[in-house]
């Protein structure tokens, strides 16, 4: 590790209050590919990082379905309407990036400091790419507990709040399997999803959207207004007001 990377690793260790050496099941490593989360062990998968410039997100950016994508319909994107969105469970930022690419201003909240650090690193590196920078400039990350932050919200509230809780059963793609196998031991399941929904419904001015596995029950709370369903997942939509141009 070069001096610059060693210095960055030490600073990150201090910021996250993590040991810089010793026994561990996971390590954060800093290098030419940015910040990576690596599981240790003989059968561990490869490192996990956030990359908005290359890989699946680049393909989706260049070849994706535009405003016809189900997530776009779920948050209310339509001609002349690009709602202000709060992604209350940002994770690795994939869905927020899609919405920002489509023109939405997206505020992201991620409560786990390691996941937030991976996301912040991905955003920082993506700003160096001239094609992706305009998208990233519409994404604004905050680390903290979404329920607390929403309950103490100051300023203009978001029109739409998007929630994607981590539940025991998720999509079966190889990418998601890898991500879940690494993230679940760190963050666990979102056992406070109903409280998250309650806070979101109080704050959002127009609608709340909850992403769920297609066959999973709805989050405990108010009745779902309507559902958009795909092959492996669905969006439960709780409308409050119509989004209009």
UniProtKB/Swiss-Prot annotation:
One of its GO terms (cellular component) is cytoplasm. S-adenosyl-L-methionine binds at residues 94-95, 110-111, 164. InterPro entries: 16SrRNA_methylTrfase_J, SAM-dependent_MTases_sf. SUPFAM superfamilies: S-adenosyl-L-methionine-dependent methyltransferases. PANTHER family: RIBOSOMAL RNA SMALL SUBUNIT METHYLTRANSFERASE J. Its EC number is 2.1.1.242. The keyword NAD does not apply. It catalyses: guanosine(1516) in 16S rRNA + S-adenosyl-L-methionine = N(2)-methylguanosine(1516) in 16S rRNA + S-adenosyl-L-homocysteine + H(+). HAMAP family: 16SrRNA_methyltr_J. Belongs to the methyltransferase superfamily. RsmJ family. This is Ribosomal RNA small subunit methyltransferase J. It is found in: Cytoplasm. The keyword Heme does not apply. Keywords: Cytoplasm, Methyltransferase, rRNA processing, S-adenosyl-L-methionine, Transferase. Pfam families: SAM_MT. One of its GO terms (molecular function) is rRNA (guanine-N2-)-methyltransferase activity. Specifically methylates the guanosine in position 1516 of 16S rRNA.
């Amino acid at each position: 590790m070069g001096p610059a990377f060693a210095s960055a690793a030490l600073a990150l260790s201090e910021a996250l209050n993590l040991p810089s050496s010793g026994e561990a099941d996971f390590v954060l490593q800093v290098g030419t590919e940015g910040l990576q989360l690596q599981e240790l062990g003989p059968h561990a998968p490869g490192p996990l990082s956030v990359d908005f410039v290359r890989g699946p997100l680049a393909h989706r950016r260049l070849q994706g379905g535009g405003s016809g994508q189900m997530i776009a319909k779920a948050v209310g994107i339509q001609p002349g309407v690009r709602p202000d969105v709060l992604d209350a469970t940002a994770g690795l930022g994939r869905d927020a990036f899609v919405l920002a690419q489509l023109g939405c201003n997206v505020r992201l909240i991620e409560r786990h400091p390691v996941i937030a650090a991976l996301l912040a690193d991905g955003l920082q590196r993506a700003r160096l790419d001239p094609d992706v920078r305009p998208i990233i400039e519409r994404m604004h990350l905050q680390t903290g507990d979404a329920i607390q932050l929403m309950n103490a919200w100051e300023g203009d509230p978001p029109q739409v709040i998007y929630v994607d809780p981590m539940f025991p059963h998720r999509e079966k793609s190889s990418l998601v399997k890898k991500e879940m196998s690494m993230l679940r031991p760190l963050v666990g399941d979102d056992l406070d999803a109903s409280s998250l929904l309650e806070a979101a419904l109080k704050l959002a001015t127009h609608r709340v959207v909850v992403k769920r596995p297609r066959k999973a029950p709805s989050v405990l709370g108010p009745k779902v207004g309507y559902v958009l369903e795909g092959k492996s997942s669905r969006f439960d939509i709780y409308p409050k007001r119509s989004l209009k141009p």
